[in-house]
């Protein structure tokens, strides 16, 4: 097997085994024969792109092309997401849930659909990324602003400030160093206007 696909096929096998799925079950889900899957996993057959996509999707995975410069952030997100299920506090889960429910009711209050989508996407990421105590304080403050405005909907300017705070939290959590010896990446997930 070519070195280029070896790590991908190893990840697919690990995903299948983690889901306690047999090759036969994977065969039924993917449409590939069990012997084809076995050959791919053993490295005796170089899988075609279509086969890789079929197997990945049968395992509830996606194969995507991403810009190389974003790989540190993507790896950080994937590492955080896989490790965060036991790490997130119930307070963080509650805050994200409250903001998601609030957002569902007040989506139209944002200045643009793009700003609303970014806010929603930021919340989705924050559901999986553990926050520090300081970041939780900022998150609590943003949520408290919304609580104070229950009687009167917040102005677009206030929504923009809250959205900026949530984006900042998301970026901080995504770019947080896992090891102090590793320098932080010099990029953001989206453009932010700090003068807003």
Curated annotation (Swiss-Prot):
GO terms for molecular function: DNA binding; DNA-binding transcription factor activity. Residues 174-196 are annotated as: Disordered. Pfam families: HTH_3. InterPro entries: Bact_TransReg_Diox (IPR050807), Cro/C1-type_HTH (IPR001387), Lambda_DNA-bd_dom_sf (IPR010982). Residues 23-42 bind DNA. Residues 12-66 form the HTH cro/C1-type domain. Keywords: DNA-binding, Plasmid, Transcription, Transcription regulation. GO terms for cellular component: cytosol. This is Uncharacterized HTH-type transcriptional regulator y4dL. It comes from Sinorhizobium fredii (strain NBRC 101917 / NGR234). The lineage of its organism: Bacteria, Pseudomonadati, Pseudomonadota, Alphaproteobacteria, Hyphomicrobiales.
